[in-house]
Amino acid sequence: MNGNKLVFLPKKSYHQLFNITFSAMMLALAIITSLISEFISIPFFSQLKLTFDISVVFLVACAFFVSLGWSLTITLASALTSFFWNTNNVIGVLTVTLANLSTILFTRLYFCLFSKRRFCWIFVFLFTTLSNALLLTTLNGILITPLFWYYFGYVQTPNFLIVAEQYNKNTDFHFFFFGINNYWLGIFCLYSFFNLVKFGLVSCFGVPIMRSFQKFYWKRALAK
């Protein structure tokens, strides 16, 4: 092992059993965690269909200790499974899936940058949290919130420019964003706070989990 540099499993036949077993285990844990999060009701956020789902931690583990391909596969499998208990919240499932994919890619990117640092995983998850908060807050303003409101019939168009204009004029919408009367300020305040808290929780679980997996599975991940 060279410092904190992670060596991925080589694509050899005798590693296939480990790949399948570990991926299946991570998928099962991700599904269970995602399901549990649906029963955790937090005032205000639950009314907006926002859940603090931290199942992505296990998808990230698969990306590092098996492969990116396997991780993307179980991410899609987890998303499809979520439709069983989220049949009326298609946009919510797609949003969580998008957040999971961005988390996987950001952790891979920042691991390449910080792999030689002493507290590697802390830096990886810290910058992933900040990047996700910025990306998803922006997407919520431009795409996700307009689609969500259009899907449930709150607005007549998913065009974010028109939605922002209607929000600013109609005080009935202000409930969604802490009573703030400006669409973009409301988007920033709500979703930056939500995403920082959510991915902060992901980091709190992700750092010790990744360090534990790194410790106990390292020998199996070394390419000899």
UniProtKB/Swiss-Prot annotation:
The keyword Metal-binding does not apply. Gene3D superfamilies: 1.10.1760.20. It is found in: Cell membrane. GO terms for cellular component: plasma membrane. Keywords: Cell membrane, Membrane, Transmembrane, Transmembrane helix. It comes from the Bacteria. The keyword Transmembrane helix applies. It is a multi-pass membrane protein. The chain crosses the membrane at residues 25-45, 54-74, 91-111, 119-139, 142-162, 174-194. NCBIfam families: memb_MPN527 (NF046054). This is Uncharacterized protein MG350.1. The lineage of its organism: Bacteria, Bacillati, Mycoplasmatota, Mycoplasmoidales, Mycoplasmoidaceae.
